[in-house]
Amino acid sequence: MSRKSKKIKKKVFKDSKYDSQVIAKFVNRMMYDGKKFISESIVYNSIDMLAEKLEEVDKVAAFNKALDNVKPLVEVRSRRVGGATYQVPVEVREERREALAMKWIISAARKASGKSMQEKLANELVNSYNSTGAAFKKREDTHRMAEANRAFTHYRW
């Protein structure tokens, strides 16, 4: 039995504008050097742009759909058996799904060239909403990798 104590999950408060915990987590992930005000303004403006481009009434629903389209269902993890290392497909927990989706959307937006961060993030959210773009491609690559290594599922732990 493990001697380590169970990690206590820190509660993330809902954001002030949309009263959504998911958007609050997204803002925190966007943040650099504790500059939350800047991060909030970037995220809020890009959500406004997202709703404007999609002509969507409910901004939070549009944001959540964009995030859901990028969430991975399975991923591969390395498992050493004997002398060989296998890529074993494993189902992803809900919290990790959300975290990976946010991470992929933000990194795809940061890698895009030109324009302001608000516009880049809004474009990536629109692409995610429409199941296209770099973040969605990352999800598809992850699923493809898991599918290719399906033979090793019996090595799960």
UniProtKB/Swiss-Prot annotation:
Annotated keywords: Ribonucleoprotein, Ribosomal protein, RNA-binding, rRNA-binding, tRNA-binding
GO CC annotations on file: small ribosomal subunit
GO BP: any one term: translation
UniProt cross-references to Gene3D superfamilies, sorted A to Z: Ribosomal protein S7 domain
Any Pfam family: Ribosomal_S7
Molecular function, one GO term: tRNA binding
Family: Belongs to the universal ribosomal protein uS7 family.
Function, in words: One of the primary rRNA binding proteins, it binds directly to 16S rRNA where it nucleates assembly of the head domain of the 30S subunit. Is located at the subunit interface close to the decoding center, probably blocks exit of the E-site tRNA.
Subunit structure: Part of the 30S ribosomal subunit. Contacts proteins S9 and S11.
Protein name, UniProt field: Small ribosomal subunit protein uS7
Source organism per UniProt: Borrelia duttonii (strain Ly)
